[in-house]
Amino acid sequence: MDNRPIGFFDSGLGGLTSIPHLKRLLPKEKIIYFGDTARTPYGSKAVSTIRTFATQIADFLVSKDVKMIVIACNTVSSTCLEMLREKFPDVSIVGIIDPAAKAVSKKCLLSSKIVYDFFHIKISTL
């Protein structure tokens, strides 16, 4: 078992809301959270600046020997994810956008199927 911590980072403290859910699923995991409250918000900054911040934070987390980095910031996920994966190939790096999009699409597909089944049954029984 890999006992190294999981690194989380966000441009502020919003990513902290993900931690309780993760701890319920993986109660023995150690977590290092970096909230960049000194430089928030990221959304209004140049992409080059955001990439610099993201690289600095990832460097810090890697120096703490994390086994994975979770980017809990939409701005960084959308502008820096691939760059960080290339820069840190030995660390698994995941963003927040893909998992959220998959969860939404799964729920929408399930809802569509339920609605379809409901109307199909209603129409069939008329």
What is the predicted role of each segment?
Residues M1-L126:
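Non-catalytic structural scaffold of enzyme domains
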